[in-house]
């Protein structure tokens, strides 16, 4: 890190900033990957060791790039449980995704998240939902066929960055809840 960071006593997401994952984001979008799954993906050794540009599974590339790590292993079935190595990597990755999934540019992205947080904290839900709708305003025609997953991914990114526990497509004995948010 530079001396400016030491002087300001701010270190940011150094690990994340050193490797821009644009290729990975494009891979996730190309294969319509459900982002919520990434934090608890399960797979086997064969998948982890396979990198094929034609594969519809982006997980091996993301794992081998270091954005996911092994969190557990089930010896009986040979299944690995993956997740982000730490909060810094997860937050950096999710922040990087926002401009690629929502109608917001990279410069405005951090300010939009601050506005979301302030609106929730102040109880200004009308402004919150107007801002959220603007994130979907320019959804391209190519996204329409995978529209539900696109919306789930945008909501997951926004609410994750706001600091909510987010669970997409939560299954209960009575059916499915599209999105669960928990503030505490």
Outline where the language-model segments fall.
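Short, small-residue-biased leader/transition segments that mark boundaries at the very start
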Residues: 2-7
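Conserved helicase/translocase motor-coupling segment
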Residues: 8-61
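A short, surface-exposed helix-loop junction/capping segment
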Residues: 36-44, 127-142
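A short, highly charged nucleic-acid-interacting micro-segment common to nuclease
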Residues: 45-51, 136-151
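A short, conserved structural fragment
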Residues: 65-73
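Short, amphipathic alpha-helical interaction segments positioned at domain boundaries
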Residues: 83-114
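C-terminal low-complexity, glycine/proline- and small-hydrophobic-enriched intrinsically disordered tails
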Residues: 103-136
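Active-site metal-binding core of divalent-cation-utilizing nuclease and nuclease-like domains
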Residues: 158-183
């Amino acid at each position: 890190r530079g001396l400016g960071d030491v002087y300001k006593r701010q270190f940011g997401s150094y690990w994340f900033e050193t490797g821009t994952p644009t290729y990975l984001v494009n891979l996730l979008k190309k294969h319509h990957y459900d982002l919520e799954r990434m934090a608890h993906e399960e797979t086997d050794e064969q998948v982890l060791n396979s990198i094929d540009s034609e594969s519809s599974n982006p997980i091996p590339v993301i794992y081998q790039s270091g954005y996911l790590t092994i969190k557990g292993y089930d010896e009986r079935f040979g299944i690995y449980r993956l997740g982000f190595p730490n909060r810094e990597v997860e937050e950096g990755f999710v922040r990087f995704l926002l401009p690629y999934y929502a109608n917001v540019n990279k410069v405005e992205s951090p300010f939009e998240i601050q506005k979301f947080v302030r609106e929730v904290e102040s109880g200004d839900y009308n402004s919150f939902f107007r801002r959220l709708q603007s994130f979907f305003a320019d959804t391209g025609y190519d996204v329409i066929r995978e529209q539900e997953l696109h919306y789930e991914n945008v909501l997951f990114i926004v609410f994750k960055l706001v600091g909510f526990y987010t669970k997409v497509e939560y299954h209960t004995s009575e059916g499915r809840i599209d999105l669960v948010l928990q503030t505490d």
